[in-house]
Amino acid sequence: MKRIDFENGTITGNILGAALPMLVAQLLNLLYNVVDRIYIARIPGEGTAALGAVGLCFPLIVIITAFANLFGSGGAPLFSIYRGKKKEPEAVCIMNTSFTMLSASALILMVIGMCFARPLLILFGASSEALTYALPYLMVYLIGTLPSMLSVGMNPFINAQGYSVIGMTSVAIGAVANLLLDPLFIFVLGFGIRGAAIATVLSQLLSVVFVLYFLTKKSELKVRLLHKDEIPKCINYAKNITSLGTAGFIMQITNSLVTICCNNVLSVTGGDIYISVMTIVSSVRQLVETPIYAMNEGTSPILSYNYGAVRPARVRKAILVLGMMILAYTAVMWSLIILVPGTLIRIFTSDTSLVQDTIPALNQYFAAFIFMDLQYIGQTVFKSLNKKKQAIFFSLLRKVFIVVPLTYLMPYALHMGTRGVFLAEPVSNVIGGSLCFITMLCTVLPELKRMEK
């Protein structure tokens, strides 16, 4: 079984070796998420309304994913750092701690979500009509919280051991299953929007079975739940996992907060149609960001391993390669969004009126997207090198302190209406992205220079 050699392989080769399978995995994962929306939008007579309703479920789905990444992406860099230090027993303990926290939090979130699904959807901006579609979808989706969180949260530990192709395969299993099951449950069996959720849950179940089979039977370092007597000695690991994962957690939770704020403002200033517009804009963003996420996550274990092994030159080169790859990709995608926005929008809807409403919104939202690269690069470096405070601060800065206030200020105080909601994003990209990247350059590069001495 081929593994990436973090110890001796070239930096560019290692990054490509990790990022390319992860890119395929993330594109498949995107397909996993987007295919629901494509099929839902084409349900006869109710597609547009149902699509907007699924958009109302995004905040809670994002919260579930955020908890998966809190313990998964929080644990994997520490796991890699300890592997770089040749401390494998500690690395295994970190992985087992993450697995235990993922399992416990998934069960808690499922129960809370099911108990409060209706009031949460109303809080997120659901009208009485939208609620008839959103509530059935969400209730079924919540049943799959445990397999969803384990498949997402444990996959980074497969990649951190160098098995990027296996990590890709675990995602592919779920994505292909979802692609096949969606039309069966939505159209053939006539379950409509509820059928999309059933297909997703079954697909997640298949994916997690593969992940756990590999990590318990085939991988070099194997996972299991913590025993009761092991919990006290793993408390410090749990604290470190949580604190390191908090940055990504905050980014996803604040994404959810921004979605709630946007939906609330758009429902007042533009009506339910603009919630559907925002759902499509968010879907396009997810499409564009997927390869960036793959590059970040592919580079992260390489940064962490070499930082733990005290190899500053390799860390510095990995940062440079990551930056060049992300900037080149974003320049191409940004050009496509500006020049042919309708092509991307029509992936998600065939409603001509909805396409026309979405085109200006998409152009406004992505006006300064290239600045977001600076945030991605800075955050990936901070997380991979265990720089918890910086990672958390810049996660909060862009979303909580810039986007959320502007989402209310621009439409109401500046009388920009729906346009103000979409323009809040590029303003935050310029300010937050620039500050994050400059701080990374001023703190990390001097530290790497000191390590050489």
Language model regions located:
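N-terminal transmembrane alpha-helices
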Residues: 6-38, 42-46, 59-74, 78, ...
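Generic alpha-helical transmembrane segments of integral inner-membrane proteins
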Residues: 23, 27, 31, 35, ...
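Helix-terminus/linker motif at the lipid-water interface of multi-pass membrane proteins
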Residues: 27, 31-52, 121-128, 184-191, ...
